[in-house]
Amino acid sequence: MFQTLMKSVFGSSNDRYVKSIGKIVDQINALEDQIKALSDEALKAQTQKFRDQLADGKTLDDILPEAFATVREASIRVLGMRHFDVQLVGGVVLHRGEIAEMKTGEGKTLVATLATYLNAIEGKGVHVVTVNDYLARRDAEWMGQLYTWLGLSVGVIVPNIPEHARRDAYNADITYGTNNEFGFDYLRDNMKHDRASMVQRPFNFGIVDEVDSILIDEARTPLIISGPTEDKTDLYIAVDEVVKRVDPEWYEADEKTKNISWTEDGNEAVEVLLKEAGLLETDNLYDVENTQVVHHLDQALKANIMFKKDTDYIVKDDKVVIIDEFTGRMMDGRRWSNGLHQAVEAKEGVKIEPENQTMASITFQNYFRMYPKLSGMTGTAATEASEFWDIYKMNVVEIPTNVPVQRIDEEDEFYKNTLDKFAAIAKAIAEKSAIGQPVLVGTVSIEKSELLSQFLDKEGVKHAVLNARFHESEAHIVAQAGRLGAVTIATNMAGRGTDIQLGGNVEFRIEDELKDMEDGPEREAAIERIKAEVKAEREKVLEAGGLFVLGTERHESRRIDNQLRGRSGRQGDPGLSRFYLCLEDDLLRIFGPDTLFAKMMNSNLEDGEAIGSKWLSKAIETAQKKVEARNYDIRKQVVEYDDVMNDQRKVIYEQRAEIMDSEAVDDVVVDMRHDTINALVTTACPPGSYPEQWDIEGLKERVEEVLGLAPPFDQWMEEEQIEPEIFEERIRELADKAMEEKIAATDPAMWKRVEKGILLDRLDHHWKEHLATLDALRQVVFLRAYAQKQPINEYKQEAFGLFERLLETLREDVTSILIKSEFRIAPPVEQELPDLPDFLTGHIDPLTGLDDSNDGDGSAQRAELFGSLAGSPRAAASPGGASGVTDNPYAGQDISRNAPCPCGSGSKYKHCHGAAI
């Protein structure tokens, strides 16, 4: 009450902040006549003028008023659109690195041009991030007209474009693309062995469209580039067959957390089934020998019970495709980890792709926090304002609408069960459609959208269904959802980014209806006809009450509900919104208070009868807040754990960059060799120990294993006052001499490439293994809570130790390969290297898709760079040490890398003749 009174007297802090920006808007408006008087050439010349001013010491804030006035006038001349004052406010907010919350239809795309142009003048690059490829292409083409007119370059990043085009797009002043494309390019760049092949340049300024969707909804799922491991198809299928025989009483499922566990009776029963299937190594299910089977059993149970087809995923083209729970869109290229995706594939009987090992990973939180300045736009951010600040240090500023919102948001209607609810929904839709009022229906899953479609078919109501199955036509369906009597069913908020205009969208109608008509008088006449029809239809829709938004159930997040409501009432248009709920809705069933069901049952509701109640609405809001808090905790935990990895990732990526930028890395290699020798001696002869305590035999073995040397330790031990430091110095001299002889017998230019190539390769290899270890640690560290320990603190401590071990192993590995291997110059490679290195073709991501053709160790690329490598710890050298890719008699044959080598050595193929493949 007191806060409400204070706001009414003094206004909210948001109101005061927006009002303060009004002074800048006044400066921009004061320049309008002056800028309007400029010729086209003079207006275009403003960009160079601003660049000169920046070079003379002015700041972006200094030139902001005139730059914004320039963009507004250029927009009028090029696009036929003038920025409103509230849009200028939004532009200032974006430039300051904040989030502009603007209602649907307020022109966020146009707002972005202000901050984008201003920051692009510096020439350091501006990234405009969208939620899908369609919007990236559309906005780059649409707003690109304005930027290029003003002398700026524009690029767009979409899947499957060549590397050179991708690099050119990043070098443009302004680059459009999706969050996935930007993130995966960052990871791929940091796996390359040559700086020239990288596509991104240093981060500068990013503007994230639909910022809540990208930075909040998708923040629970990290971006992962991975390579396939060994094929376990038979095991997945066998375990799935066992799980399909499981009795529901054998397990306990928690729908809130999507966790599932076996009961005591279930453990015993499933153990019998596994024995019958011949899947157990020992009699006891939980013996260590059965760890892998138990893991796949748990994943198969989760896949069969907790993951629902057409809700969590769909099957398309014989593949399991994940459905984004917030947008209803397909997440092409994304796969569940730890064997879960393979378990779902086995459940559905589709081709089982190999399980993958993480090679590079980053969360969206840590990716976007690398931008020195980041801003965002959305229609709904206020409910997550605290999270935006806690994670990204970004304020949310609510921008006033240009025209007051006329939409009426009605009370929710409650029904006893789903059938009653859907019958009422179908009836309401039929009534509204009959009077010409367009209806947009929001559902939470494909299954529900298709169930409602069946109800509407029975009512004889013509309608369009928009879900992950039909996403290709998404923009066109949404664009026409405001036509007279149109009924559109959309799963969650599919279609964000496309305005629903009452009466229909002129541009889309022209595109759909006149695509085959050539330019000329006939086409011009047809365009005028369509414009007139849309205008007349708009008037009829306005008379019918505008767009009616109908929600079939409440989402877990209030923000998603607000997004659905926000599709109606754009730019002062009339509109109506209403939600239909029942006790069988997931939100109420899983998270609703226990008393809700009793009160509903005692309300004497007849079948098909609805009830409206403030108490029920309050219960819904409480349940949503509970889920939002839980989801925030999950996202916060994700970033806490990734922060640990992120610190290590920065070190590794910075080290890679230094190596790539260095002409030679001989100093690094020498330091690694000396550090390795120090570690060998220190391990065998600990400081403060006596000679009789030294492990001389162990030191002999390790020096020969790592360095290929056989120093006379027995003679040295007979010397008086022998010290570990003397061992270290003498071993170092022997190792340095061996390396000097090797280098002297090798082409200097080749040796530089060898050192750099091996250093990068082994760094990548051990980083990949380190990521796998951290993943495994993450899976089990939560168990430390039972010992009254903080899992995150335990994770930090162990991760640090593992990272130190990574660096130690890297030093030893590089030293061993260089000192023990023999090299020869390979014949020159005539063909041009591919844009993407060979080892990237096995990655699971939107650019490259799935490919199980190699194990991702980069050997093919190394062979091209510096010839074959023999005698390393990873390869069995043939006599004379000249083993290599050209000496493999089995090259080209389809041999699994984990199969025994055909030569009969007893080693796996990948450790023998297949080592350089």
UniProtKB/Swiss-Prot annotation:
Coiled-coil features, chain-numbered ranges: none
Q: Which cofactors are required for activity? A: Zn(2+)
Q: Which reaction does it catalyse?
A: ATP + H2O + cellular proteinSide 1 = ADP + phosphate + cellular proteinSide 2
Q: What is its EC number?
A: 7.4.2.8
Domain of life where this protein originates: Bacteria
- What family name appears in the similarity comment? Belongs to the SecA family.
Question: What NCBIfam families would the database entry show?
Answer: PRK12904.1 (NF009538), secA (TIGR00963)
Q: How does it assemble?
A: Monomer and homodimer. Part of the essential Sec protein translocation apparatus which comprises SecA, SecYEG and auxiliary proteins SecDF-YajC and YidC.
The protein depicted here goes by the name Protein translocase subunit SecA
What is the protein's species of origin? Erythrobacter litoralis (strain HTCC2594)
